[in-house]
Amino acid sequence: MKWITRKNIRVNRAATCWLIGRFLDPEAELIFLSPEEVASIQNETGGVGFDAPDAGYPHQNAQGLCSFAALVHERLAHDPVLVEMARIVQAADIQGQLDNHPAARGLQLISGGFPLVTGDDHETVARSAFVYDALYASIKNNQAR
């Protein structure tokens, strides 16, 4: 399936790409466009748009959730590690929520550097997967204690 989002990914979009690849659609085709193109390409291709105006999963949905958190709550709420990750990504990505989780500032700071050390969004997805894999493993380890 095609998953379409805004280019120059950082916090929420990088995390959502990781979520798609690891849990939702390992064969996904990720497409990065300008914000105004996302919804029309979503509609033309039958894909799923996220973190863009009029996308299936907008930057913030009616409940105030970012696309990562919305996808977790809708499709993966049975995984307590992903639920906790959703809290972190939500706090790091949505303006005014940074103090809602102690890990949010760190994730925001790290994610802000993604486009500074990669050549394009596909490289960001590949290289940032380590961050989200490590975050998942750390939360899982902490929850097992």
Indicate residue ranges for each PLM-predicted region.
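Extended, well-folded catalytic/binding cores that form a central cleft or groove in large enzyme
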Residues: M1-N8, C17-W18, R22-R145
